[in-house]
Amino acid sequence: MFGILNRGHKIKGTVVLMTKNVFDFNEFVSTTRGGIVGAAGGLFGAATDIVGGIVDGATAIFSRNIAIQLISATKTDGLGNGKVGKQTFLEKHLPSLPNLGDRQDAFNVYFEWDENFGIPEAFYIKNFMQSEFFLVSLTLEDIPNHGTIHFVCNSWVYNAKSYKRDRIFFANKTYLPNETPASLVKYRKEELENLRGDGTGERKEYDRIYDYAVYNDLGNPDKNKNLARTTLGGSSDFPYPRRGRTGRKSTRKDPKCEIPTSDTYIPRDENFGHLKSGDFLTYAIKSLTQNVLPTFQKAFGFNNEFDTFEDVRGLFEGGLYLPTDVISKISPIPVLKEILRTDGEQVLKFPPPHVIRVTKSAWMTDEEFGREMLAGVNPCLIQRLQEFPPKSKLDVTVYGDQTSTMTKEHLEINLGGLTVEEALHGNRLFILDHHDAFIPYLERINDLPTAKCYATRTILFLKDDNTLKPLAIELSLPNPGGKGANSRVILPADGGAESTIWLLAKAYVVVNDSCYHQLMSHWLNTHAVMEPFVIATNRHLSVLHPIYKLLLPHYRDTMNINALARQSLINAGGVIERSFLPGEFAVEMSSAVYKSWVFTDQALPADLIKRGMAVEDPSSPYGLRLVVEDYPYAVDGLEIWDTIQTWVKDYVSLYYPTNDAVKKDTELQAWWKEAVEKGHGDLKDKPWWPKLNTPQDLIHTCSIIIWIASALHAAVNFGQYPYGGFILNRPTITRRLLPEPGTKEYGELTSNYQKAYLRTITGKVEAIVDLSVIEILSRHASDEVYLGQRDNPNWTNNIKALQAFKRFGQKLKEIEEKIMGRNKDSSLRNRNGPVKMPYTVLLPTCEDEGLTFRGIPNSISI
C-alpha cells in the first residue's frame, strides 16, 4: 500500500538538527567575559555545559525531550483551523545519514496518520530541554497520495517555556496571502505577530522579535564624557537607516542613549548557527578588538614609526617581534593564530597583499593611482567631469563659495595639446571629488591630536589606451577667517621636492578615499541600508511568501555582523575611530552622506548614468554605453546586474502575472510601506521611492536589494586587504600637512622622501590595527554561500522556480569565464594594471576560503 509503512498507519519523518555549538558567539562572550588570557581552560571547560552531555548518547537525550505535532493544510478542526495531530517524540539517532552537514544530527520520528488528517504542511515543535538546539529540517516521507514533504527550518528552538505560543514551521510550499489554504491562515498570521512583537520591553536572547531603533548605542557617556556620540536617525540633522531594536536601558548621563553591551540582542535566528568554529570570523573580530589590539598599543606604542618602505614590507616578510603577553592572548584562539600567523613564534606576520605580490613599487605609479578608481576597493565614486571648474553642492550661506580654484592652465599642461573644452566635450575628463564630504568636518578633524588632512579634488584624463592619467590634485582647508576655502593645486612632477609633494598629495587623496570608502561606500551603502529591509521582511512577509523565499538568502548574518560593528568597529573608541582619519566624527559623516542617498540610484545602470560614467544607448548591451570602455567594476558588474534582474523577473513572474496581483498582496504592501516609512523613516517623504504597483516595480525593487547585498558589497569589501593591506598604497590617516619651504620637514622631501611619506601617513600601531581587522573582513568563510547557490536544495517545491534558479547559476558560470577571459586580455590595461593584479573580486564563486579576492556571497555576512 503506497505510503503506509510496516509500522502501521504511520508516516516516517527525519529531523535534522544541530546542538548548541561550543563556539556559539553569545555563549563564548558570556563564558570569557573576563578576557582571553586563560580562556583555553575556561572555554573548553564550558563545553560540557554547552553541549549538555550529548556525547553520552544522542538518542537517550533527545528521544523524550523534543516533541512534534503535525498540522493539516487540507482538514480542519471545528474552528476552521488546520487539524493538529498527536504529539510524538524523536526516536532513533541516525549518525551516518547521507548528506548530513557538519555538526548535524539526524533522528527518526513516526507520526500516526489516517486519511481524515489530510496533508500536513505545518508542525509545532516543543523543546523540553534546558539547552536550545538549531532545527535544520524535517522531511516527511511517502505521504499517501502525495509523496515527500520538506520543511526547511533553520531556526534555534529554546525550551518551550520561553515562548508565549508554540514554535511553528511550514512546508516549503509557496502561497500568496490570498491563496493560503484556509486551514493555515490563522497559523500564518500568528507567526508574523510573533515576529513583530509589541514594541515593548528588553529583548531576551531567545526572542525572535524584529523591530526598529535609531543608532543611539555607539557612545558610552557613562564611562567617559569623551565617548558620548550623537544619536543617528530620527532627525533631519542626523538622518540614518534604522537598526534592530534591543530595548536596552538608557545610560545615566544621556537618557536618549542605550547602554552599550558586549551581548547586543539580535533576533536569535540572525545569529550564527552554521559556521565552523575554526573560521568564526566575527568571533575573531570581537576577540581581536577587545583583547589583542590593546596589547599592540603597549607593545609598539613607544616606537610608532616605520622608517623605510622596507620596514612596512617587513610586516609580510620577516614580521614584527611580539612580547610574550601578546602571544598569550592570541595562541588560544585558532582563528587569530591563523590570521596573525605567529606559528608558535613571537613574530607577528601578515600575508602579502595582492597589490605587492608581483611588483613592490608599482603602487606608486600615477597609472595605478588612477586605475584603482576603476578597479580598486572603491570603484563606485569616480565621476565624469561635466563642468569646469568643479563646483560645490554645499550651502553657500553656511560654507561660502567652495568652487574649485583649479584653472585651465593647471590642466592643459598635460592634456597633450587639447583644451579643457575639447577634453570635456570628448568625455575625457574625470573627477574623484571628496571636497564636499570633508570640508564641513575638516576643521574639527584637524583639531584632533593625530589628524591633519585636506579635502581633495582629483582631475584625471582618459588616455587613448583607456587608462586614467591624473592631471591635478586640489588640496583645500577651511578658511580660518570665515567662509570659503584655502586651496592649493598640486601638479605631477618627476623629481626633487615637487615629486615628493605630488606623492604626498596622492596620499591625501587616498586617505580621503579610504575613509569615504569604509564609512560610506562600505558601511552605510551596504551594511546600514540593508538592515531595515531585513527587519521589514521578517515582520511582514511569511515564510510561505514568494518574496520572502527570494530575499531570505540575501539577509544571512547581516544583522549579526552589523551588531558586531556597533560593538567593536564603529563604536566610540572603536577600530574605525582609532585607525581612520575622522576619528570621533567618522560615523556622523556617514549620516551627512545618507541625506543624499537614493534607493533607485543603487541599481548599477542608474548609478553609472548618474555619475556620468555611462550614457543611455538603446543599441548597446543593457541599454547604456560606458564612457570608459575598460572599467572593470562596471563591465563585470553590468553582466551580474543583468543576470540578477533576469532571475528576479523569471521568479516574480511565476507569482505575479498582473498588476492587481501586486497591489492586492497585503503582506507585500505592508512590507514595503514599513521598510520605507519606518526602516528608512528619515527619507520616507522622498519622491524617488518606488511604489509597488506592478510586477516590474517589484522586480526592480528586489533586484536592487539583491544587488546591494551581493555584488555591491563584494566589490567594496573583499578588496580591502588585497589593496589596503599595504598601508603605503591605501593609508587611512595623515598626521601632518605639507611642509613649508625652509623647514626641516621640507628638506626631507628631497633628502629622505620615504621618511617624509611615512611620517605623514598612518603610524605603525594604527597600521597594525587596520591590517588586523581588514584581513578578517576580507576573508571568506568555509561555508560561504555564493550568488547562484542555496544552502538547502529544497528551499521551494516550485519546479519552475527551481529551473529558473538553475538557469541563474549557469549564467553566472558563463560570466565567470568571461571575466577570466578579460583578465587575460593584455589590451585591457585596467584589468591588471602596473601592479599586475587581475580584477577578480566580482568572479561569482570561489572554491577556497580565506583571502581569495574573488567570490560574491549572497549576503553581507562579514
Swiss-Prot record:
Primary localization: cytoplasm
GO molecular function terms attached to this record: linoleate 13S-lipoxygenase activity; linoleate 9S-lipoxygenase activity; metal ion binding
UniProt domain Lipoxygenase: residue ranges: 174-862
GO cellular component: cytoplasm
Gene3D superfamilies assigned to the protein according to its UniProt record, in alphabetical order: 3.10.450.60, Lipoxygenase-1, Domain 2 (4.10.375.10), Lipoxygenase-1, Domain 3 (4.10.372.10), Lipoxygenase-1, Domain 5 (1.20.245.10), PLAT/LH2 domain (2.60.60.20)
Recorded catalytic activity of this chain's protein: (9Z,12Z)-octadecadienoate + O2 = (13S)-hydroperoxy-(9Z,11E)-octadecadienoate; (9Z,12Z,15Z)-octadecatrienoate + O2 = (13S)-hydroperoxy-(9Z,11E,15Z)-octadecatrienoate; (9Z,12Z)-octadecadienoate + O2 = (9S)-hydroperoxy-(10E,12Z)-octadecadienoate
Annotated residues for binding of Fe cation: H522, H527, H713, N717, I862
All residue ranges annotated as the PLAT domain in the record: 44-171
Keyword annotations: Cytoplasm, Dioxygenase, Fatty acid biosynthesis, Fatty acid metabolism, Iron, Lipid biosynthesis, Lipid metabolism, Metal-binding, Oxidoreductase, Oxylipin biosynthesis
Details of cofactor binding: Binds 1 Fe cation per subunit. Iron is tightly bound.
Sequence ranges of Basic residues compositional bias: 242-251
A Pfam family assignment: PLAT
Cofactor(s), by name: Fe cation
Segment forming the signal sequence: none
Single GO BP term: lipid oxidation
Function field: Plant lipoxygenase may be involved in a number of diverse aspects of plant physiology including growth and development, pest resistance, and senescence or responses to wounding. It catalyzes the hydroperoxidation of lipids containing a cis,cis-1,4-pentadiene structure.
Family the UniProt entry places it in: Belongs to the lipoxygenase family.
UniProt name for this protein: Linoleate 9S-lipoxygenase 1
Gene source species: Phaseolus vulgaris
Recorded name of the encoding gene: LOXA
